[in-house]
């Protein structure tokens, strides 16, 4: 049952003065009109008419499309004024936005506080200096820490976005970024494998051979390790992988894009957990029949995307009987291996 609803407001990326190698938002913005602040009211009301507040505990208004705090302050305030009306009358619960680390300072946060903004996500992308430079991020590692500390000091919910497979990136650098993010203790995180988009410098780098995108299996392997680090730190992982849009689809994506990328990652984590338990059982007993268990929420991860985990265990352990079973006494993302005997 869905208890959290998001009302998206798309704000084109006109506020950002930077040109990251992977970003084509300026091209997108040239083709897309920003929603005028006066139209937000109608959009919010349209979404609210589809939401059952008897079921939905939290309604969040989220400004998508780039660095919100890079917009002129008058524009920010015009959008936020409309959002605040709905928050104060109890129709929405949270106001959510994303921005860059170098677009955060005390003056900006004081203003956001005035409009009762709840959540600020930072497009951190990497904690590695060389990766930031090669990606032309235009900010430093110090800027990241300063922004995170200020956001937490002012009492906002902090989200951190990390990318995997940027120029000059390595598996170890990605894992270190996840570890450093976990030490900051944000409440939220997103993990995005790099996809080469049209009209970007990264596409030119790919075409001239100076950038090689990760394969799908490489991206899954790295993201899996980052996911485990963040999850172990009790950080809510809001998204893993890019959403499909008109600009990103399997036909035109270069790099590690998959519409079910999160399930690929979570399926690998489930497979690891199951195999670890299975090997312990096999080393301890003569049983060759087992139930692999999860609750209904995690069952698709247990069997893997398109049944890949079922096939893996069948091929690797042909002499063992394995049944994939539901056990709704288990928590989400918990997997169990139990022995069974035929009666």
Predicted segments, located by residue:
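Auxiliary Fe-S-binding modules of radical SAM enzymes
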Residues: 2-5, 209-343
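Canonical Radical SAM [4Fe-4S] cluster-binding loop centered on the CxxxCxxC motif
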Residues: 2-39
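Short acidic/His/Gly/Ser-rich catalytic and metal-binding motifs that mark active-site loops
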Residues: 16-20, 197-204, 248-250
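Conserved non-cysteine loop/helix-boundary elements of the Radical SAM core domain that shape
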Residues: 28-42, 50, 65-187, 191-194, ...
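A short, N-terminal amphipathic alpha-helix
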Residues: 42-52, 224, 228
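Short helix-terminating capping/connector loops at secondary-structure junctions
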Residues: 53-58, 89-92, 283-287
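Short acidic/polar active-site loop segments enriched in Thr and Asp
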Residues: 59, 93, 118, 187, ...
């Amino acid at each position: 049952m869905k208890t959290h609803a998001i009302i998206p407001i798309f704000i084109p990326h006109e506020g950002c003065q930077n040109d990251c190698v992977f970003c084509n938002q300026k091209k997108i913005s040239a083709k897309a009109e920003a929603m005028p602040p006066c139209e937000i009211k109608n959009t919010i009301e349209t979404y609210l008419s589809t939401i059952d507040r008897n079921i939905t505990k939290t309604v969040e208004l989220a400004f998508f499309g780039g660095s919100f705090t890079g917009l002129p302050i008058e524009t920010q305030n015009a959008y936020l004024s409309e959002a605040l009306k709905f928050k104060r009358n109890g129709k929405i619960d949270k106001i959510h936005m994303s921005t860059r680390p170098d677009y955060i300072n005390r003056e900006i946060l004081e203003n956001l506080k005035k409009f009762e903004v709840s959540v600020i996500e930072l497009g951190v992308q990497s904690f590695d200096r060389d990766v930031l430079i090669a990606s032309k991020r235009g900010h430093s590692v110090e800027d990241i820490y300063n922004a995170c500390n200020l956001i937490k000091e002012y009492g906002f919910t902090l989200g951190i976005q990390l990318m995997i497979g940027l120029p000059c990136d390595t598996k170890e650098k990605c894992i270190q970024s996840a570890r450093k993010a976990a030490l900051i203790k944000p409440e939220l995180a997103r993990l995005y494998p790099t996809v080469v988009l049209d009209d970007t410098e990264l596409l030119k780098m790919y075409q001239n051979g100076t950038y090689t995108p990760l394969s799908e299996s490489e991206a899954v392997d790295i993201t899996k390790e980052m996911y485990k680090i963040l999850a172990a730190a009790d950080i809510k992982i809001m998204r893993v992988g890019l959403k499909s849009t008109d600009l990103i689809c399997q036909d035109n994506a270069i790099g590690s894009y998959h519409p079910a990328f999160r399930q690929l990652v979570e399926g690998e984590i489930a497979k690891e957990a199951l195999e670890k338990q299975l090997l312990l059982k096999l080393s301890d007993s003569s049983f060759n029949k087992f139930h692999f268990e999860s609750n209904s929420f995690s069952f698709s991860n247990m069997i893997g995307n398109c049944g890949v985990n079922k096939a893996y265990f069948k091929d690797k352990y042909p002499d063992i009987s394995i049944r994939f079973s539901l056990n709704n006494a288990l928590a989400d993302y918990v997997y169990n291996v139990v022995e069974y005997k035929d009666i």
